[in-house]
Amino acid sequence: MKFIVKLFPEIMIKSETVRKRFAKILTSNIRNILQKYDEETAVVRHWDYIEVRSKNEENREELIALLQRIPGIHHFLEVEEKPFTDLHHIFELTLADVAQQLQGKTFCVRVKRKGKHKFSSIEAERYIGGGLNQHIESAKVRLKNPDVTVRIDIEDDKMMLVKARHAGIGGYPIGTQEDVLSLISGGFDSGVSSYMLIRRGSRVHYCFFNLGGVAHEIGVKQMAYHIWQRYSASHKVRFIAINFEGVVGEILEKVDNGQMGVVLKRMMVRAASKVAQRFNIEAIVTGEALGQVSSQTLTNLRLIDEAADALVLRPLITHDKEQIIAMAKEIGTDDIAKSMPEFCGVISKNPTIKAVREKIVTEEGYFNFEILESAVQNAKYLDIRQIAEETEKEVVEVEAISVLSENEVILDIRSPEETDENPFKSDTHEVIQMPFYKLSSQFGSLDQSKNYVLYCERGVMSKLQALYLKENGFSNVRVFAKKIH
């Protein structure tokens, strides 16, 4: 099994030195991700593409899914490589492979060639296409908009028949740009803005300001872990949680109602700047979009930026909500975001849309900044991979089992895509599919006389959700420790 990975076009037009560096980093990223899943995967860098090989055909679908989510890959070709002796031999190999596929279809042949041969790419296309047309009676040649395009790459004495072409997410490889710190709230905007910086080549660390207790923190951890696992697992990143309840309480008590929103955001960027300085991070990322809420006017954004000691990046600044939600659906964070409450917007009943610097400074003069300093000093710093380990400690009262009792129902909390791909089947027990992001709103409607065993692929989400349900008074939950294949 072989894949030919093509780099993002913006990489290819850079100078030779920069292109080599980017390609080298992308090769390393691909290797880091694929070899966690398949240790025998080989990743080799060439001048204008990266070659991925695996002997384990059963891993094909998973390798394709992983490659589709690695930043820096424009597209990749799934190919079958064979040696050949001459042009007629290429035709014979192609005929044997595509004869069944071309029955009753229109087709054309496209050839890309490298090395010294007695024929050109166009001559190869004509010869192979003509031969296929003669030998497959029900097939017809059509050069424009054919049903099937037969793609062949020829390099020296080997031909590669392209079996499929898969799109990547493009962008730059992670590590080609500097690190950033994303202020993640668990909503639509912060998840998408984090992804956009990942796609642009930055390693994204996450800073979360907890305004809503344990349940809020668990939800945000789910989103950060989801984004990291899907799009940036080639790199270690940090998750920083800062308890901001004291800061919010001080603002509610001391600050004029209309100025609360801007003051809260200024406190957040101050705290984030201190965290960024600690790790030599030059920029913080927010999900703000111009005019979306009252604090996001140009005047207010400028005043918020003045409180920051780091560059503030706003990748969504010109996006509307529909675009942001559509992007959230693409990256798989929309359902998590739907279940997330928005705390920042509710602390001020009549927020100002055009804050005045002097008034903001006056209001902040009433604020006890020792509370902010204390919140930053007591922040929790995690390697994002520790979310799973932390869950082990936090969910000590939730039993993990591998054998089911009679009165237990399996609650498959994976996403619909995962359950469609690899459904959980049981001949002896009822299986209910309820994605983890719907548990908070729908678990209570289940028959509470039964016991529920939560299942997910790696056990992280099931444990986080078990903790959430326990926090909310549900004692009839356990975690299924067994994996399905």
Curated annotation (Swiss-Prot):
Gene3D superfamilies: 3.30.2130.30, HUPs, Rhodanese-like domain. It comes from Haemophilus influenzae (strain PittEE). Disulfide bonds join 344-456. This is tRNA sulfurtransferase. Keywords: ATP-binding, Cytoplasm, Disulfide bond, Nucleotide-binding, Redox-active center, RNA-binding, Thiamine biosynthesis, Transferase, tRNA-binding. Its EC number is 2.8.1.4. Its main location: cytoplasm. Belongs to the ThiI family.
